[in-house]
């Protein structure tokens, strides 16, 4: 290759508008033409990340000493890789492995929830093609935010049957949201109503498709809902300490049947929002009296 063509190749690789997929595809040419030392810092860091993920010792040997990256440079490269590379997901197995790891690093290590729509899009695109989505779904839910649920619920309204089926599968733990007979828009509206009622009482379990065919990645803490105490979605702990009276109520609450726990927590949540004074009075009663009132549906709250 002449020097003019070589310079043209270097200029193309270091172009601001370059997509990560192009860099990835051109790795063999970069090696054949020995262009590693001509790469800009973005590309050098990106290839170093690829080498670590793929355990490619040859590639790592070429790029390890090119740049001394810091956390900011690594984050910037990861964001570029996902932002420009997600559209080319399913390019090949190695590429998908890299994209999975990049998504995981951005979500788990850098706590960047802005990438969640891109990751959700990758999940559903892969599923349409019949590819496995287990790893991506796992890292997606590691964000441990109800934003994940909202993004998935959006696919309930998709015209693509596979999108709807996957959304139902991932949201099946939510009652009344995934019934086959329900209108798709109605399912979505039901989900939004459920989320509004339960959002501050949700915690994430870590269950995923890698270990079970019926994962429940998220649950409602009925204790927290009954006491109207927000909890951390990360560690399932109340954000405020419980009073002795609240602890005593919980002890009685735990003696109820599961169905009555659900009824009481739902009634408590709705009464708290509609009439705080009545809720405070209701919380002074013994749990059996609370159940009696809840089942009677006093005040139109059920």
Outline where the language-model segments fall.
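Long, helix-rich interaction regions
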Residues: 1-100, 128-133, 142-302
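C-terminal helix/turn sub-motif of individual leucine-rich repeats
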Residues: 107-108, 141
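Ankyrin-repeat interhelical turn detector
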Residues: 110-111, 144
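Intrinsically disordered, low-complexity boundary segments flanking structured domains
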Residues: 65, 105-107
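Short N-terminal edge-element motif at the start of the domain
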Residues: 101-104, 115-117, 125-127, 131, ...
